[in-house]
């Protein structure tokens, strides 16, 4: 029995000696930092001399952070996920990887945070391509001219402030004037248009995110839309990263040849979160206490929006950033920055909103610098005449407020301008197809609606929507359109 046990021990000893003889030590040097202080979503760490900007950090309690500031003695990090109790003295380790997320078609219809974690109660994503949140912008040689229209379904925008695929169009105005409604209307109108949508909510109340998701579900738009949410209760670091997460996902799909519509709601909140982080990290403040590089941050974000050349797949990324003004002051720092970065702006005016004009868009102060090049020739031809009529009406309307007498020609301009204003009014989430858009524009320019009372205009528009001949298209000759509309509007019981 003892001999058997002894031989068994010898064999085990031989195996151990054989394993040791083939062992070669591998020296790994791992940096270890120490948490010095933490508070308000910002952590200061001592050590980690090789840490890089925007590198992820693992904290001892399981929390996740990102390097956001490098000093001689300390590393400043923003907290992205706080899973335990962060206290001074805990260890911090580098991950040697930047922040990113998994991009996959299964993200359509989902609600995620900027790190890719699900917020809708469904299972996390385990497949897809890894995309860096700080993805490079497309090079000049990879881009193409904006040449395709992106219809929003809003009559005033599609006619007078057209948007093209690959354009950056700012929506700006005071709170409560319908900025989100315009963006949502544009998203809802992309149904069956082979356009994917990403809606980023930054610093909004949690109820706002729920309302947006319910609106998308109610209209069947959640099937082609992804929500990226960093609400007001999220750490400022997540609020800062939210638009970059949406942009990285949109750029990935654009590189695959897809058309993507991106909504940033809103970049004023994003600028405030960046200001908060910068002040907490002791960066020198600039105008209105914003950091000096806030312009370049927004420029880097919005430069992702473009139309790729056919050699690069022909995809596009259209951006609709939203900005908030105070008392209609568009000369403030962030609004002027965004106006100078984007390709045009849709300006909402409180006086128009109070007068019952919906959407409350000030056509005179709104502009689309490149959208007209993508507008269909038929719609563009009608819009030129309409813009002239409307601008003349706005000039003459001022004199009517003082009781000035007008000659018959001016009275005609005023009457047709009032008619056009009624035609441009639109209920929330009411949408017009491009063919219906062309129909009412021709009807106005041909004077087919001049004899209708202003109170009957909504009914006339409803007749155009419901009775429009399906055989009519944007390529149909204008004479055929005019004949069909004359027959429709004269026989309709409006």
Curated annotation (Swiss-Prot):
EC number(s) per entry: 7.1.2.2
Site features described as Required for activity, chain residue numbers: 366
GO terms under cellular component: plasma membrane; proton-transporting ATP synthase complex
Subcellular location(s) of the protein: Cell inner membrane
Main location group: membrane
Family annotation (InterPro entries): ATP_synth_asu-like_sf, ATP_synth_asu_C, ATP_synth_asu_C_sf, ATP_synth_F1_a_nt-bd_dom, ATP_synth_F1_asu, ATPase_a/bsu_AS, ATPase_F1/V1/A1_a/bsu_N, ATPase_F1/V1/A1_a/bsu_N_sf
Subunit structure: F-type ATPases have 2 components, CF(1) - the catalytic core - and CF(0) - the membrane proton channel. CF(1) has five subunits: alpha(3), beta(3), gamma(1), delta(1), epsilon(1). CF(0) has three main subunits: a(1), b(2) and c(9-12). The alpha and beta chains form an alternating ring which encloses part of the gamma chain. CF(1) is attached to CF(0) by a central stalk formed by the gamma and epsilon chains, while a peripheral stalk is formed by the delta and b chains.
Listed name of the protein: ATP synthase subunit alpha 1
This protein's UniProt keywords: ATP synthesis, ATP-binding, Cell inner membrane, Cell membrane, CF(1), Hydrogen ion transport, Ion transport, Membrane, Nucleotide-binding, Translocase, Transport
Gene (UniProt): atpA1
Catalytic activity from the UniProt record: ATP + H2O + 4 H(+)(in) = ADP + phosphate + 5 H(+)(out)
Principal EC category: translocase
Species per Swiss-Prot/TrEMBL record: Hahella chejuensis (strain KCTC 2396)
UniProt lineage: Bacteria, Pseudomonadati, Pseudomonadota, Gammaproteobacteria, Oceanospirillales
Coiled-coil segments: none
